Swiss-Prot record:
PANTHER family to which the protein is assigned, alphabetical: FERRIC ENTEROBACTIN TRANSPORT SYSTEM PERMEASE PROTEIN, VITAMIN B12 IMPORT SYSTEM PERMEASE PROTEIN BTUC
Species per Swiss-Prot/TrEMBL record: Serratia proteamaculans (strain 568)
NCBIfam families: PRK03784.1
Name of the protein: Vitamin B12 import system permease protein BtuC
Keywords: Cell inner membrane, Cell membrane, Membrane, Transmembrane, Transmembrane helix, Transport
Keyword Membrane found: yes
């Protein structure tokens, strides 16, 4: 068989395998979504969703929360995958590189300076601005200082620690109950999400869909600067567009649910290890897997304690930290 036919056959098999992965992930998200609507202090299975109790528990309380969880999980996972490609760092992730903390500190300072009287829309925009500033700062370090992967990771962690310290000082010196409640919320949680936050949830959707369709551009960027330019890709323009998209997704996610770590790190790596490496399929796969995993984590956060709720950030950190350590031992290119 000629080499060209062999290559075409292998490419066809790989695409078929990638599409099968996406189908399985879609089925997994559907199961997790149904389970999320059913789980809680009062369990209501699909056969009971037409009853009076379901009108409150399923359609008014759990449905908006489940939709928010899905979109935030998808956004964080896709943002993590794009950051890993953009920074050429296998351990890049919104939480680890301080982007989520940048959004958080902007939100906390807005509440502190505004005495809790500013509208929710303004606070959400401040979170987006904080995420954008942190992402552009990291990108500037990566490009101008020629930092190695390890140094960039350390810079991101250090910036995240500084942001966490600023938030802690702000809470310590504040007598505002809103700010103290906000600090608990910054641990990650969807407890206050209902239909009133639908505009924040919808704000994620167009940017998320656009980013999931940029696999071709990311594949070109992975070839290197010279090859990407030869293929007609404007690297400066695309980097700025991708940074804006990442900042938007992370900022809105933080405004909606607080800081949730490790989703953007673990999900892309798990999918790559399963053989999903083409960015055109990896990004939609990350969206589906991130939605399903965060739905499962949200159910765990809701049902673990009786009449109480764990911060979802605690659940993802408990599961993600061991996986992060394992990934550190596997990534040989981190120098």
């Amino acid at each position: 068989m000629p080499a060209s036919q062999t290559f075409t056959l292998l490419l066809h098999k790989q695409r078929h395998r990638d599409k099968r992965h996406l189908l399985l992930l879609t089925l997994g998200v559907a199961v997790a979504f149904v389970f999320s609507l059913s789980a809680g202090d009062v369990w209501l299975w699909p056969s009971q969703w037409s009853g009076e109790a379901a009108q409150l528990f399923v359609w008014q309380l759990r449905l908006p929360r489940a939709l928010a969880v899905m979109l935030v999980g998808a956004s964080l996972a896709v943002a993590g995958a794009v950051m890993q490609s953009l920074f050429e760092n296998p351990l890049a992730e919104p939480g680890l590189l301080g982007v989520a903390n940048g959004a958080g500190v902007a939100l906390v300072l807005t509440v502190l300076l505004g005495n809790g009287l500013l509208p929710v829309a303004f606070m959400s925009l401040s979170a987006i601005a904080g995420a954008l500033v942190m992402t552009f700062l990291l990108l500037s370090f990566a490009r101008r200082k020629r930092l190695t992967n390890a140094r960039l990771l350390l810079v991101g962690v250090a910036l995240g620690i500084v942001c966490s310290a600023v938030m802690t000082w702000a809470v310590y010196f504040s007598s505002s109950l809103d700010l103290r409640q906000l600090m608990y919320w910054m641990m990650g949680g969807f407890g206050g999400v209902d239909w009133r936050q639908k505009w924040l949830v919808l704000a994620l959707l167009p940017v998320l869909l656009w980013l999931c369709c940029q696999g071709k551009a990311l594949n070109f960027m992975a070839l290197g600067e010279v090859q990407a330019r030869q293929l007609g890709l404007s690297l400066h323009l695309w980097r700025n567009l991708l940074v804006l998209a990442i900042g938007w997704l992370v900022g809105v996610s933080v405004a909606l649910a607080g800081v949730i770590g490790f989703v953007g790190l673990v999900i892309p790596h798990m999918l790559r290890l399963s053989g999903l490496t083409n960015q055109r399929y990896l990004l939609p796969g990350c969206a589906l897997a991130g939605a399903g995993v965060l739905l499962a984590a949200d159910v765990v956060a809701r049902i673990t304690l009786l009449s109480a709720e764990l911060p979802i950030g605690v659940v993802t950190a408990t599961l993600g930290a061991p996986l992060f350590i394992w990934l550190l031992t596997r990534v040989k290119s981190l120098r």
